């Protein structure tokens, strides 16, 4: 498959994989801001990320990648910040300094404390080193540890969403992680009532509903 495209076309292009929580974050941001984009699937199971053409777009061979004219951006956080700078409505960061810091903290916990411990590249590396039971324990421990920190961080400042009654940056990172906890990893959410409540709130929003893994162009017919 060729991933080389005309960078000078106006329409945004998102290189994505349906189950990637990192790509999921960007899909929410694009939809929340009402931006039209072309979805270009990168099948991580088949190794499309190692394709030489795709690596011209992202030398790391990961998703997501965003192409905006002659601009190419990799990494979900960088992409979302770029979109928020270029398309500032609705804003993804609150004006309140404390709430802004909480958004950054929650985002960091997801990016560094949870997601890296459960991604496909890691488990491919560990495939012959741990069994299925150990893999499940690894994932559960990483998510539980991160969710415990998030619950404590957000319980006192949360409204309908992570830092109030408006959707901000933290919500874009929390939603995919909580969705995966419920639907993919089957984590017991009883110890995390605040996060479970967010999940219900996110499911009411079209931008979040349309971004879920189960509704993407490359979602398999059977999961």
Swiss-Prot record:
One of its GO terms (biological process) is toxin catabolic process. GO terms for cellular component: cytoplasm; cytosol. Disulfide bonds: none annotated. It is an enzyme of class 2 (transferase). It comes from the Eukaryota. GO terms for molecular function: glutathione transferase activity. The keyword Transferase applies. Residues 10-91 form the GST N-terminal domain. May be involved in the conjugation of reduced glutathione to a wide number of exogenous and endogenous hydrophobic electrophiles and have a detoxification role against certain herbicides. CDD domains: GST_C_Zeta, GST_N_Zeta. Belongs to the GST superfamily. Zeta family. The keyword Nucleotidyltransferase does not apply. This is Glutathione S-transferase Z2. It comes from Arabidopsis thaliana (Mouse-ear cress). Its EC number is 2.5.1.18. It is found in: Cytoplasm, Cytosol. It catalyses: RX + glutathione = an S-substituted glutathione + a halide anion + H(+). Glutathione binds at residues 20-25, 49-50, 62-63, 75-76, 115, 119-121. Pfam families: GST_C_3, GST_N_2. NCBIfam families: maiA. Residues 96-221 form the GST C-terminal domain. InterPro entries: Glutathione-S-Trfase_C-like (IPR010987), Glutathione-S-Trfase_C_sf (IPR036282), Glutathione_S-Trfase (IPR040079), Glutathione_S-Trfase_N (IPR004045), GST_C (IPR004046), GST_Zeta (IPR005955), GST_Zeta_C (IPR034330), GST_Zeta_N (IPR034333). Its main location: cytoplasm. Keywords: Cytoplasm, Detoxification, Transferase. PANTHER family: MALEYLACETOACETATE ISOMERASE (PTHR42673:SF4).
